[in-house]
């Protein structure tokens, strides 16, 4: 089946795939190597992408859903966008800068393998929440198994990124 995949930078990928094939495998076969292989069960976060601005494990998304799952943009146009980690880094958005600053402040290292899960879950949390508790972050990262960062440090880094993004620099001391 011909499936058109729309990527964030308005580049499209036309592929001949079974609609049930995982988005992870289709993207990797087409050169998107920032999508890593991992548990293949949607738990580890290594294959995380942004689909319509939300973090999703690409191993659990059938590529056929990217064709039919649409949302309306601010200008009323229907769009489906997929953002890989490489695309996200190139965009250098305010969210990305805040995440990197929060991670840096908390001593989070980025090994290159599990980065997508950490960064995209942080993005989803800071972008779509007006407030964020430690429990919310713990719940969001509970299934991640980062090979280079312990869970407590990751939670602190995401909370710090949230503070920076929302201009709540002073709340760092309130958490402790």
Spans of features found by a protein language model:
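Signature of N-terminal electron-transfer/Fe-S-associated modules in redox systems
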Residues: 1-176
């Amino acid at each position: 089946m011909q499936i058109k995949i729309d990527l964030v930078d308005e580049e499209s990928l036309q592929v001949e795939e079974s609609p049930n094939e995982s988005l992870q495998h289709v993207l990797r076969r087409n050169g998107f190597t920032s999508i890593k292989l991992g548990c293949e069960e949607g738990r580890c976060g290594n294959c995380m992408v942004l689909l319509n601005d939300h973090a999703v494990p690409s191993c659990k998304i059938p590529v056929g859903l990217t064709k039919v799952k649409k949302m309306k943009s601010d200008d009323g146009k229907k769009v489906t966008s997929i953002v890989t980690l490489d695309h996200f880094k190139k965009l250098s958005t305010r969210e990305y800068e805040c995440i990197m600053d929060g991670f840096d402040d908390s001593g989070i290292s980025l090994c290159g393998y599990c980065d997508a899960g950490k960064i995209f879950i942080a993005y989803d949390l800071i972008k779509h929440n007006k407030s964020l508790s430690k429990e919310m972050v713990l719940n969001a990262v509970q299934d991640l198994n980062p090979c280079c960062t312990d869970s407590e440090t990751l939670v602190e880094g995401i909370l710090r990124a949230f503070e920076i993004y929302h201009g709540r620099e002073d709340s760092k001391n309130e958490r402790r």
